[in-house]
Regions:
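ACP-dependent fatty acid/polyketide chain-elongation machinery
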Residues: 1-60
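A glycine- and small-residue-enriched flexible loop/hinge segment at structural boundaries
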Residues: 35-85, 128-142
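Generic anion/oxyanion-binding catalytic loop in active/binding sites
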Residues: 10, 64, 148
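Acyl-thioester C-C bond-transforming condensing/cleaving domain
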Residues: 16, 27-31, 80-91, 97, ...
């Protein structure tokens, strides 16, 4: 069966318009900026501007980590872009999502609020399969709902597996991609301990990530 990409959706540091994001990347614009300036070591990250209220009611946000919020928003934008038929068989719609670590913000909040009442939805909020599950619930997809956790390759693997599923005739519509939301102090400190995050001089955060430069020093979270 022929496979085609019919819609795109992004929530990125360069906005949620795919064309504008691509143009910004082609111009070499950096979205990396300083974060958590109170930490012992300077850190830079690329943050996506995001208004959760655009996609969720206050009640719906209960137990939904930012990583799942981003996934739902991007999936909705992709479905809108595709003009997906409203009468599609739910059992023929699959969700294939990449997520390397899951809901870091939920776990961080639980740790920092250990002496207070623990939110009862903390566990499902930080599970790596939460983004796929929330996308499936939002789109009422009843086909395969799968999560791929393969470090930085997670989203790429998810998209490839989705294409295979369509090609094999397992689904008619595959919502595929990935999300991550790791810019919280605990995760930043953990990556710093591995000495993998890029260093930068004061005022030079935007130039921190230069993977092909001889003086490269690491990457930035986003």
């Amino acid at each position: 069966m022929q496979v085609a990409v019919t819609g795109l959706g992004v929530v990125s540091p360069h906005g949620d318009d795919t064309g504008a994001m691509f143009d910004a990347l082609m111009r070499g614009e950096s979205a990396v900026q300083p974060v958590f300036t109170d930490l012992p070591k300077p850190t830079a990250a690329a943050l996506a501007p995001f208004d959760a209220a655009r996609w969720f009611t206050k009640l719906q946000l209960a137990g939904v980590d930012r990583v799942s919020q981003l996934a739902v928003a991007a999936a909705e934008l992709a479905v809108q872009d595709a003009g997906a038929p409203g009468d599609a068989d739910p059992e023929r719609i699959g969700v294939y999502a990449g997520c390397g670590m899951g809901g870091a913000a939920a776990l961080e909040a639980a740790y920092r609020g250990a002496n207070a009442r623990m939110p009862p939805l903390t566990i499902p909020a930080f599970m790596p399969n939460a983004p796929a599950a929330h996308v499936a619930m939002r789109r009422r997809a009843q086909g395969p709902v799968l999560t791929y956790s393969v470090a930085c390759a997670s989203s790429g693997v998810a998209i490839a597996e989705a294409a295979k599923a369509v090609q094999r005739g397992e689904v008619d519509i595959a919502i595929a991609g990935g999300s991550e939301a790791l810019v919280v102090p605990g995760v930043v400190l953990a990556w710093q301990a591995m000495q993998t995050l890029a260093s930068f001089a004061p005022g030079e955060a935007a130039r921190a990530v230069r993977p092909f430069a001889s003086d490269r020093s690491g990457f930035a979270l986003g």
